[in-house]
Amino acid sequence: MVETFLASSAKKFYEYLLENNKGVEVIPHRQAEFKNPTLTIHLKQKLFGLENVFLEIDGKDHLIEKEGDVEYVAYDEDNLVLILKFNTPEFYKDSFILKSDLKFLVKNVEQFFISQTIALPTKPPFSPKLTSLLPDLNAEQQRAIMRIFSHPLVYIWGAPGSGKTQRVLFQAIEKLIEADKKIALVAPTNNALEQAIKTLIEKFDEQGIARESILRLGIPTLEFSLKYPELCEKTKKENNLFSANPRERIKTANVLAMTLDGFVARYGGLDVEFDHIFLDECAFAPLPKVCTLCACNAPITLLGDHKQLQPVCEITQSDKQKDNELKIWGYSGIYLEHIFSDRLFEEKLDFQYTKASVLKQTHRYGNNLASILNEHIYQNGLRGKDEESGLYFLDTSKLNTQNIKHNGEKNISPAEVVGVKQVFNSRFDWAVITPFVNQRKILIRNGLPYDKVFTIHGSQGQEFDGIIFSPVILSYYLTDSHNPQALYALNVAISRMRKKLVIVCDYDYWIAQEGQFIQRLLLGSKPYKEE
């Protein structure tokens, strides 16, 4: 049985993390202030998620959860401030450790498959009348919507800006709300979930759909809870709908929005029957967790782009190759049907049950960039808009690095730090992205704002008007486009931009890298001149 295999897989992954001292990350903080019963913590870094954060006090872990010993009050992602409330204040001690523990989430997956049965969805989706669709839908988007309502398992594949969320997802959810159906909107991370909800709410407001049709389960960021209090499961705003009966809101809301980990933890207690499930950013979601969505026999629509980042997995490549029960944690959710067959480990995405719909037109990129992405990555006829994307380079080969602070770390480029500082200014919505952790550190050490400098994984789910990209060096795992995973990661970095991309690098070094994606981008770029 699939459930037995998945439960065993989760148990083995848990033991692997335990034996190899992995999965636990101490979250550093700058300072903390306790005013009974509230603890305010100023963090040094963003939290990846909120479902697996603990406070260790006197050697004991306290899960931060609703109505637990410690619960969330607010998380201000922009200012890196976490506010907690102690329901049992005597537990507090000045010497505490804030940490995230992946093992807790893996244990939840094991418990889920012990208690639930799963199967590929067979229930036909609700079929609404599609005579009143948005007037600006293109033919590909219309076909995608029709496919969602004609088959139990559908994958909508599209590059950034192709309308997966703003057009296809919104239109499908709108039709289901009109019919008073129950919908689960799921995403692999807090950030991805809130981005999807924000996009939907913009369309809801345009079309006159009540915001309270959506209920966001779990812990929102402070910015989200202040902007959309009526959507949140718990908020101190007086006008939120939860002042009455939380259980009633779960029953009456058409859309229950939650992270994938939230679905795993709460599905058994929700006591609702979903008519349709949508998983956004499915390619970034680990396959075992995505399998939990199959407990409902509700139609499932996967939305995403498998030519971008795959799930983060703490299992080494060599260990994955030795054991299939560990290996599946590196597979993404688009392989959902494969786990119910003997085709999963053939390393081939070969849909037989899943119906795919491809969106090949993007409004994010000009044709100049779309053609490069199609040539190297998508190879599906990707088209952009007529207006060109701004592609530029700044050559660092002759820049003076004398004043750059560094300790000779591996995988850094002081010259690129100089170049980035020449381009970056606060008058434009810039973000700096580099594949290398050490390069990010020295960029910040030399004056770049920490909240504007990202590794590729850290930039996932965010957008900026301009991206300054610091590639540092050719690396098989991070920048060598002959490695598909590195190529897809580079695609993520590029796709964070709305208007401009500036590649700050040693131009001659990269131009000599024949056949590389970065070389092709440089060939299509112009020298950068500050406007």
Where do the model's predicted regions map?
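Pre-ATPase regulatory/linker segments immediately N-terminal to the P-loop/RecA-like helicase/translocase core
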Residues: M1-M146, I209, L217-K237, Q310, ...
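N-terminal pre-P-loop "Q-motif" helix
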Residues: L133-P152, A159, R167, M258
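Short hydrophobic/aromatic beta-strand immediately N-terminal to the Walker A/P-loop
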Residues: V154-W157, A184
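Phosphate-binding Walker
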Residues: W157, G163-Q171, N190, Q195
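Walker A/P-loop NTP-binding motif
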Residues: T165-A179, T199-I201
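Conserved helicase motor core of SF1/SF2 NTP-dependent helicases
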Residues: E178, N191, D261-F263, G268-L279, ...
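A substrate-engagement module of RecA-like helicase motors
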Residues: K182, I197-N254
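Conserved Walker A/P-loop ATP-binding site and its immediately adjacent core
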Residues: I183-E202, V437
